[in-house]
Amino acid sequence: NVAIYELVQNSESLIVMVDGDCTISADSLVALLEGAKLNTDAYLLAAIPEPIGRYSESITRNTLNGKALSGNFYAITPLFYEKIKQTGFMLPVGLIGDDSLLAWVAQCDFKLSNGVKNGLMVGIKGALFGYHRLVPNTFKNIKMYWRRLQRYSLRHIQQNCIKAYLTLENDDFASLPSHVVELYRYHRPEHIRTDNRLNTFLDTRTSKQIKTISV
């Protein structure tokens, strides 16, 4: 919100978002710039994480197919910037996973009823970034990993609340309330994952926590 509505002054700018713990090269930035020139109708340009671990191939494939956005390193195009300003869309305060919602908004062109549109989020093959992979092999890392799983659970619940709001109230993403807490009234038991015991435990715990939060 701050970047879009306060910091960016030139509407023709390509807005590059980078996490502080990422490593990128000049070639990656050039690739994003070239990608912007070649994909003038795109909203988001997605970079690709350097191959680490067993999920790298899947992430790369989904990114290049316009189905995934890594929040570590990506670019908001001038077209998306202008559309955000025109619609007045803002990320709700307290949201976990800003990049996930931005990708959702871009793919659906600001309305859930539009469905996913191809070409609005584009993976850029030459835009690579390095990152630190958290491995739970020490007590400190285990604690950090556990906190990360809790955040993933909250993100999952929040995204389901957003979808419920858009389905029941107003399918325009720009109509989302200013604070994510206002969306918790749309939380339902079926939002709790049942694919494995750990996710069920985490989501049940998260569900109980948000029920104690008042708007």
Describe each PLM feature range.
Residues 23, 45-59:
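Short beta-strand-to-loop element that shapes/binds the nucleotide-sugar donor at the catalytic cleft/hinge
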Residues 93-118:
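A short, conserved alpha-helix in the catalytic core of glycosyltransferases
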Residues 27-44:
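Conserved donor-nucleotide/metal-binding helix-loop-beta segment in metal-dependent transferases, i.e.
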Residues 11-23:
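Short beta-strand-to-loop acidic/aromatic patch adjacent to the donor-nucleotide binding site
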Residues 135-215:
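Terminal low-complexity segments of carbohydrate-biosynthetic enzymes
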Residues 69-88, 99, 104, 108:
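Conserved nucleotide-sugar donor-binding
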Residues 2-14:
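Active-site nucleotide-sugar/metal-binding loop of Leloir-type enzymes
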Residues 116-148:
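Active-site donor/metal-binding and catalytic loop motifs
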